Curated annotation (Swiss-Prot):
InterPro entries according to UniProt: Ribosomal_uS8, Ribosomal_uS8_sf
GO CC, one annotated term: ribonucleoprotein complex
Name of the protein: Small ribosomal subunit protein uS8
Xref: HAMAP family: Ribosomal_uS8_B
The entry's keywords: Ribonucleoprotein, Ribosomal protein, RNA-binding, rRNA-binding
Keyword Magnesium: no
Keyword rRNA-binding found: yes
Alphabetized GO MF terms: rRNA binding; structural constituent of ribosome
Protein's GO biological process: translation
Subunit structure: Part of the 30S ribosomal subunit. Contacts proteins S5 and S12.
Function: One of the primary rRNA binding proteins, it binds directly to 16S rRNA central domain where it helps coordinate assembly of the platform of the 30S subunit.
NCBIfam families linked to this entry: PRK00136.1 (NF001109)
Family: Belongs to the universal ribosomal protein uS8 family.
Length: 131
């Protein structure tokens, strides 16, 4: 059993990017789908889909590369962990590399980027940073 499924997801994406894989497959969960949705909306991944039957569903993430073969994901960092949760208010949401990256926040209105949460006046659990 994985103690931190979100960190496992980020590690699989990071390893897939370093190995220049086109697709990364991992066990699916609703939170992982929300994270993949935000990363797709922001252009870090090309797409995602849930495959398989209910008990053993898999999340397939299609990684995105430019014409030169460079990945759109330069780095991923887990912030809030099971042993130390990190919660932020609206004004405490960090800017990632001056706006080149995103912070992903789990709010009462769902999982969204830090800038979306800031515009809506929301805080929440700071899940990770992607740049």
């Amino acid at each position: 059993m994985i103690s931190d499924p979100i960190a496992d997801m980020l590690t699989r994406i990071r390893n897939g990017v370093m190995a220049k894989h086109e697709v990364v497959i991992m066990p699916a969960s609703r939170m992982k789908q929300y994270l993949a949705k935000v990363m797709k909306q922001e252009g870090f991944i090309a797409g995602y889909e849930v495959i398989g039957a209910k008990p053993k569903r898999q999340l397939k993430i299609v990684l995105r590369y430019d014409e030169g073969g460079a990945s759109f994901v330069s780095g991923l960092e887990r912030i809030s962990k099971p042993g130390l949760r990190v919660y932020v208010q609206r004004g405490e949401i960090p800017r990632v590399y001056g706006g080149l990256g995103i912070a992903i926040v789990s709010t009462s209105k769902g999982v969204m980027t830090g800038s979306q949460a800031w515009r809506q006046g929301l805080g929440g659990e700071l899940l990770c940073k992607v740049w």
